[in-house]
Amino acid sequence: MKELILLGLYLLGSAQGAPPGQPEELLDSVDQQASVQQLSSEYLSLANPSDAEALYETPLDEKTLSGHSSSEQESSEHAVAEHSAGEHSSGEQSSEHMSGDHMSGEHLSEHTSEEHSSGEHTSTEHTSGEQPATEQSSSDQPSEASSGEVSGDEAGEQVSSETNDKENDAMSTPLPSTSAAITINCHTCAYMNDDAKCLRGEGVCTTQNSQQCMLKKIFEGGKLQFMVQGCENMCPSMNLFSHGTRMQIMCCRNEPLCNKV
């Protein structure tokens, strides 16, 4: 092939009509062309399919490696992203679980507090249920005490009323037949002076039925001014004070001459 190229170059040079006096220049040009052809032949020899495949394999390998690296990087990034998403999901799930536990804890605490409240309410109801019974017992006790006091008061009043009735009966009832013959004489007198002397009406009166001997004294300025004594049907004993005047009334019965001065 080299020879063919040289022959073509020679023919090309002869066709151009090179002068026969320049064979050396022609040879130099042929040598240069030969070197160029050699370089081109080396280049063409490099263009062998196996070499070309080798040359192409290197970029393909690099591309494959780069693609593999990029795919690995993408897959690793995808895996990292999925792992991160999984961790995020698991974190959310764990947080939800924790929140669920927290909610369940709160629910349990609320349930416990409700049970505690219900227990306190039950105990309060029990205590309040016992308290009315105690209060009822205490109320029964004061009522009993009050009834005892009332009964005591009533009994005392009844005794005092019976005593008064007895006294009144003794005062109001006539003397028995045995003492009927015994008359009670009351001294009568009126308008007595300071010397306790009767001015008039001095005498004796005999009590009858419920009559009593009565003695009435009137004092003015601390001195006895007027005095009356006799028999009276109604004779309450009393002391009256009015404007410096004092009136004293004394009554007696079943005693002869009880109002005698």
Swiss-Prot record:
Residues 1-17 form the signal peptide. Keywords: Repeat, Signal. CDD domains: TFP_LU_ECD_SP10_like (cd23628). One of its GO terms (cellular component) is acrosomal vesicle. Residues 129-147 have a biased composition (Low complexity). Residues 50-176 are annotated as: Disordered. PANTHER family: ACROSOMAL PROTEIN SP-10 (PTHR17571:SF34), URINARY PROTEIN RUP /ACROSOMAL PROTEIN SP-10 (PTHR17571). This is Acrosomal protein SP-10.
